[in-house]
Amino acid sequence: MIRRYWNINFEEMMKAGVHFGHGTRKWNPRMAPYISAKRKGIHITNLTRTARFLSEACDLVFDAASRRKQFLIVGTKNKAADSVARAAIRARCHYVNKKWLGGILTNWSTTETRLQKFRDLRMEQKAGRLNRLPKGDAARLKRQLAHLQTYLGGIKYMTGLPDIVIIVDQQEEYTALRECMTLGIPTICLIDTNCDPDLADISIPTNDDAIASIRLILNKLVFAICEGRSSYIRNP
């Protein structure tokens, strides 16, 4: 895999608050190599390590995108949800930004059935057929469609397991991470000072509680994905 330059700027990371970790009482000792200091009761992340692993992650997704691999971005907490959707749509990735429904990946056959039901209901609605049903039936199916849109809308075009999963907040998305580990799906995980850096294939130490920090890291990753897709188009 060729190493590339991704314009990862320390001043930009500082401005976004990437370096701010959790309180010193709320930390995982395994994060010690990724922490550079303590300041006013807060751990400070070593941005040199952040830049290194973010660069490695960008190289990985660029290479995967240039080979037409599929990506899933997962981030369901309120501070991450909007950034996850925007980043995924920009890079034509699948995403989950509401509740992670257990078994989305490990019970893929059930997920496929749900997705087919979702697609069928969308077609029925677009064709206006739901409005021709009795009011009770129409209301029930519309509620079902709204539920599927909320939780599966970001993966409605997914036809198989993803090749790489990008996870925002290891602790919040632990179920999704465990499913990836069970299936052997490579993961890139944004980790704060209270996380375990050994659980993902590439862990990027960062502030996973600040919108600006999450957005910056995701923007770098999706830029690399877009560049990789363009590389495939130029050199199929």
UniProtKB/Swiss-Prot annotation:
It is found in: Plastid, Chloroplast. Gene3D superfamilies: Glucose-6-phosphate isomerase like protein, domain 1 (3.40.50.10490), Helix hairpin bin (1.10.287.610). It comes from the Eukaryota. GO terms for cellular component: chloroplast; small ribosomal subunit. SUPFAM superfamilies: Ribosomal protein S2. One of its GO terms (biological process) is translation. GO terms for molecular function: structural constituent of ribosome. Keywords: Chloroplast, Plastid, Ribonucleoprotein, Ribosomal protein. Belongs to the universal ribosomal protein uS2 family. This is Small ribosomal subunit protein uS2c. It comes from Manihot esculenta (Cassava). The lineage of its organism: Eukaryota, Viridiplantae, Streptophyta, Embryophyta, Tracheophyta.
